[in-house]
């Protein structure tokens, strides 16, 4: 028994030792995490993610969280007798649906995440794109989809003030245009644009897949590291397809604007965030600008 305990303790020390150079590298640096997918629906995984976020904060990393909430929106639309509709992969967002989206993302999902982080020992503050003019939206310009927006501009003053004071900003992807009309914006897009505006060290997208796969049916074909050009070629060849295209595109845009590394990881795995940031092997796909050689 004692031998087993010693082996377990030795393994813990080894893990902490392996994490040290990464902690040193990213201490004081901003990491933007897009939290969504199945990690939001499983209570055990949800609690693990919140503890990981607090851990990042405790070791000096400056986490900024951007979240989605699609399943919760669908659930409330169903309760209210509004049938969810999608067109070209975008949620059709008429006035009634926009009210529900804002109510759910800003009033429920956001506050739950804030409460869970605070319960885990962190100091979280909830925001949406409207707060402090953080995000100014504009319509995507497609007919028949209503108040679906994209990011027109970002003002990170309120986020920087919170981060500099030791708080963890939690941001929902609802923003207003210049007339004050609320728009629903893809959370991956919001995370990428905020990461770029903050000059983040990392953008991490938590998804329901292992990462970028050469063969989407075979998890063993995971591409652990690639650069912008390789990522673009995978899209052109059709290897990156379907719902992965906008995620990879979001990563590429953020890198082109100065983010050092963008990661696509499986949020369903316990401690996925810490495994990706603080271990040599990582667990997902990291996309970097050409020539980037840091940790």
UniProtKB/Swiss-Prot annotation:
Family membership noted in the UniProt record: Belongs to the acetylglutamate kinase family. ArgB subfamily.
Compartments, as annotated in UniProt: Cytoplasm
A Pfam family matched in the record: AA_kinase
Gene3D superfamilies for this protein: Acetylglutamate kinase-like
Gene Ontology CC terms, in alphabetical order: cytoplasm
GO molecular function: acetylglutamate kinase activity; ATP binding
EC number(s) on file: 2.7.2.8
Cytoplasm listed as a keyword: yes
CDD domains cross-referenced by the UniProt entry: AAK_NAGK-C
Keywords: Amino-acid biosynthesis, Arginine biosynthesis, ATP-binding, Cytoplasm, Kinase, Nucleotide-binding, Transferase
Functional description taken from the UniProt entry: Catalyzes the ATP-dependent phosphorylation of N-acetyl-L-glutamate.
GO biological process: arginine biosynthetic process via ornithine; L-arginine biosynthetic process
UniProt xrefs under InterPro entries: AceGlu_kinase-like_sf, AcgluKinase_fam, ArgB, Asp/Glu/Uridylate_kinase, Glu/AcGlu_kinase, NAGK-C
Binding site for substrate: 69-70, 91, 184
Species per Swiss-Prot/TrEMBL record: Microcystis aeruginosa (strain NIES-843 / IAM M-2473)
Catalytic activity: N-acetyl-L-glutamate + ATP = N-acetyl-L-glutamyl 5-phosphate + ADP
Pathway info: Amino-acid biosynthesis; L-arginine biosynthesis; N(2)-acetyl-L-ornithine from L-glutamate: step 2/4
Site (Transition state stabilizer): 34, 247
Superkingdom as given in the UniProt entry: Bacteria
Protein name as annotated: Acetylglutamate kinase
NCBIfam families reported in the protein's UniProt record: argB
């Amino acid at each position: 028994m004692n031998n087993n305990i010693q082996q377990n303790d030795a393994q813990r020390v080894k893990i902490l030792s392996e994490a040290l150079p990464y902690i040193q590298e990213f201490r004081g640096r901003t990491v933007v995490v897009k939290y969504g997918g199945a990690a939001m629906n499983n209570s055990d995984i949800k609690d693990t993610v919140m503890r990981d976020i607090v851990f990042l904060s405790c070791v000096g990393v400056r986490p900024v969280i951007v979240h989605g909430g699609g399943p919760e929106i669908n659930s409330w639309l169903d309760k209210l007798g509004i049938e969810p509709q999608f067109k070209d992969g975008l949620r059709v967002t008429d006035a009634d649906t926009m009210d529900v989206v804002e109510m759910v993302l800003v009033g429920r999902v956001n506050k739950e995440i804030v409460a869970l982080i605070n319960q885990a020992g962190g100091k979280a503050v909830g925001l949406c794109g409207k707060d402090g003019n953080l995000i100014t939206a504009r319509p995507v310009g497609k007919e028949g989809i209503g108040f679906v927006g994209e990011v027109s501009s970002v003002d990170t003053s309120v986020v920087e003030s919170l981060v500099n004071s030791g708080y963890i900003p939690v941001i929902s992807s609802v923003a207003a245009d210049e007339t004050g009309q609320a728009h629903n914006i893809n959370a991956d897009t919001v995370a990428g644009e905020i990461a770029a505006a903050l000059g983040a060290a990392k953008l991490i997208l938590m998804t329901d897949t292992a990462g970028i796969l050469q063969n989407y049916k075979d998890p063993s074909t995971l591409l652990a590291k690639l650069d912008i050009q390789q990522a673009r070629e995978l899209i052109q060849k059709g290897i990156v397809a379907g719902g992965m295209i906008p995620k990879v595109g979001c990563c590429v845009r953020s890198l082109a604007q100065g983010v050092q590394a963008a990661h696509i990881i499986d949020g369903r795995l316990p401690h996925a965030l810490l495994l990706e940031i603080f271990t040599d092997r990582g667990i997902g796909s990291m996309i970097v600008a050409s020539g980037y050689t840091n940790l």
